[in-house]
Amino acid sequence: MKFATVKTILMTAQSNQQHGVIKTHNNDVCFSFANGDSDEDDIIAYKSDTEVISVLGKACNSYIDCEAIETIEVYKQ
């Protein structure tokens, strides 16, 4: 998926305080921008020069190459 598309989807989810799942061919990473939702991870950085997004996880950080993303599912609260 293109970096600009990923960033647009996630920034829209953030402004609407939504949550969802980023799916790659071998991994799913949950995220949440909902206030007070501590059960899921949060997107913390977009790096345009490498086209990677960083997700702060419970046990470790995830770094996802945008080209590896197959789908992003976004859900309303």
Locations of regions flagged by a protein language model:
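A short beta-strand micro-motif
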Residues: 4, 18-24
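Acidic, low-complexity, intrinsically disordered interaction modules
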Residues: 24-68
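Short acidic, Gly/Pro-enriched loop/turn segments at secondary-structure junctions
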Residues: 61, 73-77
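A short, compositionally biased
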Residues: 12-19, 47-51
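Short amphipathic beta-strand and strand-loop transition segments with alternating hydrophobic
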Residues: 11, 43-45, 74
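Charged, amphipathic alpha-helical segments
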Residues: 1-12, 36-40
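Intrinsically disordered, low-complexity boundary segments flanking structured domains
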Residues: 8-9, 16-18, 41-42, 59
